[in-house]
Regions:
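Short beta-to-alpha linker loops that shape the active-site pocket of alpha/beta-hydrolase fold enzymes
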Residues: 106-110
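Conserved catalytic-core motifs of eukaryotic protein kinase domains, centered on the activation segment
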Residues: 83-85, 114-115
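Short beta-strand element of the alpha/beta-hydrolase
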Residues: 68-78
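Short amphipathic alpha-helix adjacent to the substrate-entry channel of hydrolases
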Residues: 85-105
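A glycine/proline-hinged amphipathic helix-loop "lid/cap" segment
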Residues: 1-65
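A generic structural signal for alpha->beta connector loops
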Residues: 44, 54, 99, 136-138
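Short strand-loop-helix active-site module centered on a catalytic nucleophile
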Residues: 57, 72, 94, 115-152
């Protein structure tokens, strides 16, 4: 039996990670970006970079996404790593399954920016969505790892 396409993708991610020498936080961030860029994304997914009260973010939507349904997603990465880009493929699946648009926030990261900056960025993004006319009743806030902590 031949390896699956999914296994081939995981093996490629390991190969990319293993080939890199990492010395700094920036090196680790770049490595994570490269690893996650190996994951394939469906061709019908749309992404749009936006500024959210000065914080970069990315809208991710599928053809099924309804304009008034929104997920504010806060990525994981120990407050050191991660971005809309590293989570894009997973969030594309989330947008399709939920029929919602996903706003992935690139909150400020440590160690350059101390805590509570990620909390401030997250609250600011929530308020920005309300100002854009998104009803709190049609919004979900979620995240993984550090982003899950921010969502709470």
């Amino acid at each position: 039996m031949a390896p699956s396409k999914e296994l081939d993708t995981v093996l490629e991610m390991i190969r990319v990670r293993s080939a890199e020498v990492r010395k700094t936080t920036d090196d680790d961030r770049l490595s994570y970006e490269r690893i996650m860029s190996v994951l394939p994304m469906d061709d019908d997914i749309e992404t749009e970079r936006v500024g959210v009260n000065g914080t970069p973010a990315e809208w991710i939507s599928a053809p099924e996404s309804q304009e008034n349904r929104v997920i504010l997603y806060l990525h994981g990465g120990g407050y050191l790593f991660g971005s809309a880009r590293t989570h894009r493929v997973m969030l594309a699946h989330m947008a399709r399954a939920s029929k919602a648009r996903v706003l992935a926030l690139d909150y400020r990261l440590a160690p350059e920016i101390p805590f509570p900056a990620p909390v401030e960025d997250s609250v600011s993004a929530y308020r920005w969505l309300l100002d854009q006319g998104i009803s709190a009743k049609k919004m979900v806030i979620g995240g993984d790892s550090a982003g899950g902590g921010l969502a709470v």
